[in-house]
Amino acid sequence: MQIYWTKINKIIEETPEVKTYLLDVPEDFTWEEGSHTHLGLEGFNAGDKPNRSLVRHMSISTLPSEGAIGITTRFRKPCSEFKTILGNLDVGSEVAIFKTHTNVPLKREDKNVYLLSSGVGLATFRPLVLEYFKCADNVNQIHSLNIDSTKDFLFTNIFTSAPDKNFTAQFVDNRKDYYEKVKNLAGDKDGLFYVVGSEKFLVQNIEVLREQGIKKEQIMLDKHEKELPKFFSVDLSI
């Protein structure tokens, strides 16, 4: 397993609770849209075994063409040990990245794509949308729906409806409106539905989508293949 140590190049305060850390790109480090990585803080591998409390699984919120590895995360008090340390790091501090992989690349199957996210989960979809804007080949349209109870919606400069690009962005701040909209979107029985958020959020979305007749093959989760069965364990086959 290769561990890349790199430096924080810039810290962006997206909202009062959310920051994006832009990391220098190590030589020969590559990724594609929809990737996640493991972020390790200083000392995580100092002992015989890795200190898991100093490691987190994070989505990469940038594309390689942007020249930085973006890690976007929410700091909600009380913070974990990991978030407390990360929140105190400055530009120039070193962090480690390793085990980078993508479960949710943008599928180009001549279908409509629906991006369903909760809060900072939207960061996973930022590079997918940017990649779509660069090249829309074999993607009919993209519709993003994000729920964030704080009302401090993220990346609104990118997630703004653009009819000329066949892109729709919606933000809601309550569950009732959110799930009503999900049911409406599920009227497209041939669409591809990407879902990113907490495990509870994933399960609830899958339940609603499956009840509307969406097949599990049409639902994309940012989870390793071996983790998928627990999310689809409730058989709602039509």
Feature locations, PLM:
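Structured catalytic/translocation cores of nucleotide/phosphate-coupled proteins
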Residues: M1-K7, V18-T20, D28-W31, K107, ...
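Ferredoxin-reductase
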Residues: Q2-V91, D148
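FNR/FR-type flavoprotein reductase catalytic core
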Residues: T72, P78-I238
